[in-house]
């Protein structure tokens, strides 16, 4: 099929993947209103086209946490990425390195920290959840630092897992889930051979390394779900701030008061995020939450944003709203599932091209020149 956008990669991924995997990455919480608003609210932000602004060259590079990026895009942490392509986290890390940006490795990746970092000459970022098992958290941090990772993304919007109705219907969970997944795999032989057989081991690499025993999909649902800690507060995170010597980025901020708390805590950055609409349905989209947060803490720390970003135009929109950069999750996983490393590389090329076109037509020659004036106000 012809690939010209992330939407095309989504369709290609749908064709290739067993339904339980496609709907796991494609779905959101409850009735998925917030997931849809993430996309729609970004699309509703009208770019302000300008003409004759002498935009001879456009520079989309930027610097985040003293790290130079070819464009203000980071691959977001996505659990089970290694189930979407053979050793998927490794392929994603290589694609990101080739295009001059970092991958953020999920706590619950299939490939462990050491395997992924060894595959890339560029230091990846690492994402960690707040978990009851502090021993696991400390072990993961120590291993990440030893591997050369210096950027920590700390996810705080998951004290309990969100209810994702699609998972029960698709076979990720629900009655006879294991049998349903096997049947689906048999009906998708290309994936079954390439990933199901040749992509083993299919365990949670970082969890297995800590527990010194193999893990599986049941552990992803069981062990992880049992370890989320709703009692956590900012004070409980102080040991991590003291332990981790590199930049620490708090992921899951939707309210200006929480952003101010992150500043007081000493975070180096925040990620304005609703977990892609996968946690609490009915909350603000990231695009709508971002302006008030930027007004509250811009200049005090680095502001990143995710959720709903499907194109380079969306990147420009988020930056115009006050973000310093963005993370993309679903979009790159669709591309990875459809075409592996080459798919992610092509997707990032599409994002870069779309950014350059949008910046040229709004009169911005650099990331620094993207501002609220790049959008039409009052709409």
Curated annotation (Swiss-Prot):
It holds the Pfam family FMN_dh. The active site is at residue 275. The keyword Protease does not apply. InterPro entries: Aldolase_TIM (IPR013785), Alpha-hydoxy_acid_DH_FMN (IPR012133), FMN-dep_DH (IPR000262), FMN_HAD (IPR037396), FMN_hydac_DH_AS (IPR008259), LldD (IPR020920). It comes from the Bacteria. Catalyzes the conversion of L-lactate to pyruvate. Is coupled to the respiratory chain. Its EC number is 1.1.-.-. Its cofactor is FMN. One of its GO terms (cellular component) is plasma membrane. Residues 1-379 form the FMN hydroxy acid dehydrogenase domain. It catalyses: (S)-lactate + A = pyruvate + AH2. Keywords: Cell inner membrane, Cell membrane, Flavoprotein, FMN, Membrane, Oxidoreductase. This is L-lactate dehydrogenase. FMN binds at residues 106, 127, 155, 251, 306-330. Belongs to the FMN-dependent alpha-hydroxy acid dehydrogenase family. GO terms for biological process: aerobic respiration; lactate metabolic process. It is found in: Cell inner membrane. PANTHER family: L-LACTATE DEHYDROGENASE, S -2-HYDROXY-ACID OXIDASE-RELATED. The lineage of its organism: Bacteria, Pseudomonadati, Pseudomonadota, Alphaproteobacteria, Hyphomicrobiales.
């Amino acid at each position: 099929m012809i690939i010209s956008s992330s939407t095309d990669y989504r369709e290609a991924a749908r064709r290739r993947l067993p339904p339980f995997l496609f709907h796991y990455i494609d779905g959101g919480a409850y009735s998925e209103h917030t997931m849809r608003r993430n996309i729609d609210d970004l699309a509703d932000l009208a770019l302000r086209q300008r003409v004759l602004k002498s935009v001879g060259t456009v520079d989309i590079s930027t610097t985040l946490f003293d790290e130079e990026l070819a464009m203000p895009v980071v691959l977001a942490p996505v659990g089970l990425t290694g189930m979407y392509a053979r050793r998927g986290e490794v392929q994603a890390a290589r694609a990101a390195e080739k295009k001059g940006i970092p991958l953020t490795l999920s706590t619950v990746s299939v490939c462990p920290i050491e395997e992924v970092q060894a595959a890339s000459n560029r230091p990846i970022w690492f994402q960690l959840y707040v978990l009851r098992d502090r021993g696991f958290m400390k072990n993961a941090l120590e291993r990440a630092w030893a591997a050369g990772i210096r950027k920590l993304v700390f996810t705080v919007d998951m004290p309990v897992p969100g209810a994702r109705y699609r998972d029960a219907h698709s076979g990720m969970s629900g009655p006879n889930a294991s049998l349903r997944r096997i049947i689906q795999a048999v009906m998708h032989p290309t994936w079954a051979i390439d990933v199901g057989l040749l992509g083993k081991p299919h365990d949670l690499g970082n969890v297995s390394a800590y527990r010194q025993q193999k893990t599986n999909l049941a552990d992803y649902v069981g062990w992880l779900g049992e370890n989320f800690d709703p009692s956590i507060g900012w004070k409980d995170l102080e040991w991590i701030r003291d332990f981790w010597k590199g930049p620490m980025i708090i992921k899951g901020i939707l309210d200006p008061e929480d952003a101010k708390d992150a500043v007081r805590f000493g975070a180096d950055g925040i990620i304005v995020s609703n977990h892609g609409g996968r946690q609490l349905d009915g909350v603000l989209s990231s695009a709508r939450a971002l302006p008030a947060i930027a007004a509250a803490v811009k200049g005090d720390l680095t502001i990143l944003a995710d959720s709903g970003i499907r194109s380079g135009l969306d990147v420009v929109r988020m930056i115009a709203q006050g973000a310093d950069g963005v993370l993309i999750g679903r979009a790159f996983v669709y591309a990875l599932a459809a075409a592996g490393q080459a798919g992610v590389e092509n997707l990032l090329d599409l994002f870069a091209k779309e950014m350059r076109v949008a910046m040229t037509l709004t009169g911005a020659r650099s990331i620094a020149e993207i501002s609220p004036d790049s959008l039409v106000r009052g709409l």
